[in-house]
Every structure is written in structure tokens, then in C-alpha cells.
């Protein structure tokens, strides 16, 4: 009787997890379809994950309902083979798309890849081919049998379970964790050295970088623990229930994470949900505000974009520091000039020839003009950053190319240095001429 109750409980949890995963993936895919602002490289990777999870969950749900709690499928039936193929192929594909997501984010932020779309064909080749190889090996070795509420690799083939399924899981998760760790380390270094005061929001952004990989681990860690216990001959109830629910509902929790990371998406669905209450007079203002801002590219200190955030944070930081250093240097020069006695300067200017004085005045005019050009470049950079910020989507994950104004400032500085060197050489030549003329006059 206790075993029958456990089977029925596990079956109910399995059905709930299947439907919740289907629901979550549909929410993400519908939002991507409706919101054109979300269509970019990263969202295409997420969409492929959701498609893989959705197809897996639809097929497995149909098989679960048709076989019933007792799993009446025979070990050689078509339904049993289809169930095992669906679980193995669909789960591996979802894991690999998660790895591709981690690599894409790392590639955009740390490596600043200008054309991440060129990797999409490689992603498709890996994510659809590797699961197929594992399925072919599983079928060739005839390892499939009814296992609890579904069909999968028999308990007699523990080596195949870990070699074809949980072994790739460990490899995929470790590589994804390393990529996310490198990305988080890079962004943290930018945030720590940033001049921005919104560090709390920056830490929220930092959490958004790693939450999907945490969900990935939590959803499958119970499955690994349960299978290790099964391999040792133990079949506890609680690990089996946790394994059933979290592994099957991975698509749901991943979809919730994607929606949480993207304000455009939760505004869109929030406006749809509160529209029902607004018809009865509840949450009217909230629904209007969400509907009004669902397509709004709200600029924020973190820009709500993985790649654009890091680029603009580092750019603003470097420009601010450079600009502050220039201002401090100018202030120091002005203070030194004010502290210097004026009478010796006037006497020195009277002793100098008119040509030398004109050259000094020309040098000062050129320095003023060059400073104005640099100031205009800084203003242009600030304007371009503001324009690019307004064009970004919330969590659109698009990267913006660096502005050419940085090169302009560098060229202006090089030009200033060359002019200063030429002016100094001219002053030395003029001084030598004056000294020679004075010596000639003495003789």
C-alpha cells in the first residue's frame, strides 16, 4: 500500500512538473514572438533552449498520461523507447543550449565579439548532434526498460547512465560555471572600480549573470544524488520525489529566470495579467503603467544589457578619470602661475625679443584651441553614450561598438605633443639667435 501511494504521488508530481514546464516555455516563446525588441543573438539561444524543453515536455506529458501511474509500457514497446529517447535527447539538448548561453555571454562581455551570430551554426550543430549520438548508443546497447513512472536506461547499466547522461551533465555544468565565473569576475572588477553610485543595482545585474546557471545546477543536483543512491542499492522516497519534480520542471524554472532577467518581458505579461483585474476596477493604474512601459527602453545604471553594461561602464569610468586628471592638471598649472611673482615674469618678457613673445602667445592659443577640441570630444562621447543607451533594450544582450571619439582624443593629444615640441624647438632657435645678436652688438 505504501509503495502504491508513493507511485501515485510521484506520478502526480511528474504531471504537474510537465505542465508547469510547458507553461513557462510558452510564456517565453510568446513574448519573444510579440516583442520585436527582444530579437537578437542571446534571445535566439534562449528561444532554442525553450523549444527543446517544450518539445521534450509535450511528448513526455502525452506519454505519461497515456501510460498511467503504473507505467504499463513493455520494455520493447514503441512508447517505452520513445519515452527514453525524449528524456535523453531533450535533456542533453537543453543542457547544451545552456552552455551556449554561458559562452555567448562570456563572448559578448569579456571578449567583446562584434559578430556573435557567426557562432549560431556551430551551436546548432553541437546541440542537435551530441544528443543524437548518445541516443544512438543507448538504443544500440538495448539498455532501455521501464524505470518508475517513465522509461529510461535500466538500473543494471549504471555505467551507461553516467557515461551517456550524467557524465555529459558534469562536463557541461563545469564548463558553464567556469565561463560564468570569468564573466562575473570581469564585471565585478569594472563595478568595483566604477565611479557610479548605483552599486546596489550593479550587484543585481551581477546576480542576473549567474542565476540561470544556479537554476541549472539546482534542478539536476537531486537527480544526480538519487541516481548515485540507486547505484548503491538505496531507493529513498524523498530524493526520488525531488529528482522527479526538479529535473522535469527545469524548463519552468529556467523560463522564470529569463523573465526575471528581462524587464520588458515581465512588463508585457504583467500588463496582460493585470488587465483581467483592471476590468473589475482593480490595479488600473498599475496595468496602465505596465502597458505604457512594456516597449520602453528605460536607461538604467546597468543598462539592462549584459554586454552594453560592461562596455559603457568601463568607457564612462575611463573617460571620467581621464577628464578629472586633465582638470586637476589644469588647476595645478593655474595655481603655480598665480603663485609665481609677476614682476620677474614682466622683466623677462621685456628682455625677450618680440618674436619669442609672439611664439609663446601662439603656443598658448594653440593649447587653448586643443583643449576646446578635447572638451568637444568628451561632450560628443557623452552624447553618443546617451544615444546608444536610449537605443538599448532592457536585457536585450546587444553589444555596442566602441566609439571612434576615443581615437580622436588620442590623435588630438599626439598632435598637441608634436606642436609643443615644434614650438619648443622654435623658441630655442630664437633664443640662440638673440644671444648671437647680442654678442655681435657687443663686439
Curated annotation (Swiss-Prot):
Annotated localization: Membrane
Biased composition annotated in UniProt, kind: Polar residues: 396-410
UniProt KW Transmembrane keyword: yes
Keyword Magnesium: no
Protein topology in the membrane: Multi-pass membrane protein
Example GO molecular function: cAMP binding
Upper classification of the organism: Eukaryota, Amoebozoa, Evosea, Eumycetozoa, Dictyostelia
Species this chain originates from: Dictyostelium discoideum (Social amoeba)
Extracellular side: 1-11, 66-89, 141-161, 230-263
Amino acid composition bias (Basic and acidic residues), ranges on this chain: 429-443
Domain of life: Eukaryota
Function: Receptor for cAMP. Regulates axial patterning and cellular differentiation during late development. The activity of this receptor is mediated by G proteins.
Transmembrane segments: 12-32, 45-65, 90-110, 120-140, 162-182, 209-229, 264-284
Modification after translation: C-terminal Ser or Thr residues may be phosphorylated.
Main location: membrane
Keywords linked to the UniProt accession: G-protein coupled receptor, Glycoprotein, Membrane, Phosphoprotein, Receptor, Transducer, Transmembrane, Transmembrane helix
BP GO terms, sorted: adenylate cyclase-activating G protein-coupled receptor signaling pathway; cell differentiation; culmination involved in sorocarp development; negative regulation of gene expression; positive regulation of gene expression; signal transduction
Residues modified by glycosylation: 8
Residue numbers spanned by region Disordered: 325-354, 396-443
GO cellular component: plasma membrane
Family of this protein: Belongs to the G-protein coupled receptor 5 family.
InterPro entries from the UniProt entry: GCR1-cAMP_receptor (IPR022343), GPCR_2-like_7TM (IPR017981), GPCR_cAMP (IPR000848)
Biased composition (Low complexity): 332-352, 411-425
Entry protein name: Cyclic AMP receptor 4
Parts of the chain on the Cytoplasmic side: 33-44, 111-119, 183-208, 285-443
